[in-house]
């Protein structure tokens, strides 16, 4: 029996503006923010108003389509020059999220051979919309493949938010929960709160509750105890960058969960689209890890909670070694075993 599930969206194209669900306001208010300039798009990404690797790529694509409409130049050469400058500018917003650069490169390549400004503007808008539409289909496919890894009644642990509001729709790590709900397969989510910005506590719980999916919130340091006492059957996470050998960058704390999964003998899955793979890098050691402002740790909702002047180390991501990963779930299926060979083979087939 199929069920209609309410699935929130995070990015909408309005033709002359972009509407983004301001995720910094969740769960207390559902506020959509209107972006009309490339600077506002950049700031929205940096400030985590829009977040999640696929969603960042989508909003960046729309941002480039938007700014291209506002160029006043009459010559295509000058248009391309300005466009490349804005591509480079947007690329400075979140250095670890490979989908950002994938979307920027795709937008850039879409108009490489175009000879008129009007045609370039039209193609950029069409390409951005296509990126969003494709991501929705990709996420649904990831959800279908991921659901095959689980059984009705499973308790599944996740971290951060790799859900619908981090993508075009459905999400990656959360996609099987939505697809399962539609198909009558009950999966219970255990969500790590995900310090310091609380994407699990604020966002994952919010969107799953919106859809009527069972979710239990735990503190990050409860994970081992929860696996031990709550019959956690598996762990599933998203990804911000997966390199050629399968090493995976994701929200800080992900590697902790992978180590716990190994110890307790439960599967640890990564769910991500092919656009999250960066096969130009051979191992996780080559991934640049973004470090964020110390106030994310020293303050909670603006209130100082540590002694002033405390030294802080605040990386946004960690890298999980491939040997800790049971399988990488993509829109093309599940990669297992020799990740370097399987990933290379997958990209040979798609090229």
From Swiss-Prot:
Top-level division of the source organism's lineage: Bacteria
Q: What are the alphabetically sorted keywords of the record?
A: Amino-acid biosynthesis, Isomerase, Methionine biosynthesis
- The record lists substrate as bound by 51-53, 94, 199, 250-251
Provide the GO MF annotations for this entry.
S-methyl-5-thioribose-1-phosphate isomerase activity
* Single Gene Ontology BP annotation: L-methionine salvage from methylthioadenosine
Instruction: Give the Enzyme Commission number.
Output: 5.3.1.23
Which pathway? Amino-acid biosynthesis; L-methionine biosynthesis via salvage pathway; L-methionine from S-methyl-5-thio-alpha-D-ribose 1-phosphate: step 1/6
SUPFAM superfamilies under this entry? Answer: NagB/RpiA/CoA transferase-like
**NCBIfam families with a match to the protein in the record:** eIF-2B_rel (TIGR00524), PRK05720.1 (NF004326), salvage_mtnA (TIGR00512)
Q: What does this protein do?
A: Catalyzes the interconversion of methylthioribose-1-phosphate (MTR-1-P) into methylthioribulose-1-phosphate (MTRu-1-P).
Family listed: Belongs to the eIF-2B alpha/beta/delta subunits family. MtnA subfamily.
What does the annotation say about its assembly with partners? Homodimer.
- Name listed for the protein in its UniProt record: Methylthioribose-1-phosphate isomerase
